[in-house]
Amino acid sequence: MSNLWTPSIEVESVNGTREVSLTTRHLMNRNVFLQGTIDSDMANQFLSQLLYLEQELEEPVTIYINSPGGEVNAGLVIYDAIQGSNLEINMICTGMAASMAAILFCSFFSVRFSSSL
C-alpha cells in the first residue's frame, strides 16, 4: 500500500468543526478504495473498513477499484469479506482491474467502468 500524504478536510458536526482525513470522510460517505497492489495490508484495512460499515446496513457501500492485482491469498480475504457481507455493495473500476483485482471486480453483479466520476 502506498504511504502517500492524505489531505485533511474540515467537517461540521453538532460539536462544531473538526478536521478529518479525506480517507475518513470517504469512509463516512460509505466509499472504500482498493487502489494499488493487493497485499495483506490492503486486505486487513479493507476488512476492518467493511466490518465498520456493516454497523449500518441501510445505505449501500461503493468500492472503487484501481489495481494491477497482487497476492491471491490477500485477494481471497477481500473476496470472502465482500461475499459474506450483508451490505449492498457497488463496485466501480476507476482505472484498471487486472489479475486478482479482475477476479474481485468480475465477481459482482453491480459493477461499472468509470470514464468520469
Predicted regions and their residues:
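Terminal-region recognition feature
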Residues: 1-117
